[in-house]
Amino acid sequence: RPIMSATETAYVKNTKLYDLRLISTIGFDADDVAAVQKADGVVAAAGSVNADFIWQHDNKERVYRAHMLTDNINEPVLTAGRMPENGSECLIDSSRFSEDMIGQTIEISDSNDEDTKKNFKYSTYTVVGLADSPLYIHTLRGTTSLGDGTLQGFVLIPEDGFDFEYYTELYVTCTDEFPLYSDAYDDYIDTFSDTVESAATASVNARFDRLTSDGKAEISDAENELNDKKAEAETELADAKAQLDDAKETITSGEAELADAKKQLDDAKA
C-alpha cells in the first residue's frame, strides 16, 4: 500500500483520480457508462482508452502511452501551454519534456504494427501543452510490451483523436470522504466496487444479449433471403423446363406435319 503525504492526498483529490478502474473484454459503450453513473455512491464515471505506441524522438525510438482526456476524472494539471481544442492536438508529460516541445508534432512511427496504428485517428499530433497527470504520481512510468519494455512517458489526447468502437476501460470516482488508502477507505471501496461492478456487468451483458440477438436476426434474415432466392430460382428453372418441353412438343408436331405433307406429296406423284 503506498504511503501518501498530505500534499499527495490533496493532489489526488483535486485532480479527481479514479477510485475504481473497470475493464471488459467486449468493451464499454455510452450506455454502460451511464448505467454505472447511476449506481449508488458514484460521483463520476467516464469511459476511456489507452494505447502504447512507438515515437521516434531525437533519432531514437521510445515507447509512450497515450491516454484519453476524460471529464471530471483523472484531470491533468497544465504546467505550460494550453489544453487541446481538437483531436489532432495533445498534451505531453511535463517531467519528460520542456516547453520547447510546444508547437512540435508527435508522429506515430511507421515501426508500429497495424494494430497499434489503428488505435489513432491521426498519424501526427501537435503538442499544445505540458501537463502532470494523477495517473502518474511517482517517477516511474510503467512497463509495456513494446520496445525495451519500459514506458518513457505519457501523452494525453482528446477522445476524437482516437479511433475505436468501444471504450476499453471505465473509470469511476465515489462519494467517500475517508483518508486515501486508509482501512476505512479500503473497506468502503470493497463494498462500492461490488455495486459498481454489478451495474457495469448487467449493462454489458444486456448489450451482449442485444448483439447476439441482432446477430441471430441477421442470420435468420439472410437464411430467409437465401431460401426466397432458391425458391425463385427453382421456379425460374421449372418455367424454363416447361418452355423447353413446349418447344420440343412443337418440334415433334412440326416433324409429324412435315412427314404427312411429304406422304401426301408422294401419293400425289404416284
Q: For each predicted feature, which ranges?
A:
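Membrane transport/envelope proteins' first extracytoplasmic loop
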Residues: 1-270
